[in-house]
């Protein structure tokens, strides 16, 4: 029997090169840390694609399309083309790299510019919290920035799996709640949110994916 999913969300992962975006995605989608010498942790060239189903409520699954973007400047033109069709994003910095934190606002402003006229929901992620002894960014600083920018904040580690599952769950649930409120809508020509596959026998979930007659976006 085919897997049931009520929505598909396209999420983008952005931030400076070497902050660990690819390792986070490997941990979330494959349940493992690829290791620093693995090609999986090499800087991304262009954009890589991952996917996974996430159950946010009993019997309600969201299909996540996850786009891992290159942090290097020479690939930014490729990255920008993916903003517009994303409903959510992980803004990742390395807590042991001050510069990556200082660039967060630049990434955010760029994303807001290219996502127009659609809405994108962000989660600020302080990665590599297993290296707390090498921390260059305090939790208080990161929490203040996230509050100023209207985002939630979480610290993660792909190496020991700290808060990896939680971070994807938080962002997915936030988007799902906004859809239920009518603040994010399925729209023709936009790939950010799509209705999912629901067998005819599952009437309760079927109702959840019917397009709204009104949209308050």
Swiss-Prot record:
GO biological process: autophagosome-lysosome fusion; phagosome acidification; phagosome-lysosome fusion; protein transport; Rab protein signal transduction; vesicle-mediated transport
Swiss-Prot/TrEMBL cofactor(s): Mg(2+)
UniProt-listed Gene3D superfamilies: P-loop containing nucleotide triphosphate hydrolases
Disulphide-bonded residues: none
CDD domains, per the entry: Rab39
InterPro entries per record: P-loop_NTPase, Rab39, Rab_GTPases_membrane_traffic, Small_GTP-bd, Small_GTPase
PROSITE patterns according to UniProt: RAB (PS51419)
Residues annotated for GTP binding in this entry: 17, 20-23, 44, 71, 127-128, 130, 158-159
Subunit structure: Interacts (GDP-bound) with C9orf72; C9orf72 acts as a GEF for RAB39A. Interacts (GTP-bound) with HOPS complex components VPS39 and VPS41, and STX17; interaction between HOPS components and RAB39A contributes to obtaining a functional HOPS complex that promotes membrane fusion driven by STX17-SNAP29-VAMP8. Interacts with BECN1. Probably associates with the PI3K (PI3KC3/PI3K-III/class III phosphatidylinositol 3-kinase) complex. Interacts with UACA. Interacts with isoform a of RASSF1. Does not interact with isoform c of RASSF1.
Protein name, entry field: Ras-related protein Rab-39A
Organism of origin: Homo sapiens (Human)
Source lineage: Eukaryota, Metazoa, Chordata, Craniata, Vertebrata
Gene of this entry: RAB39A
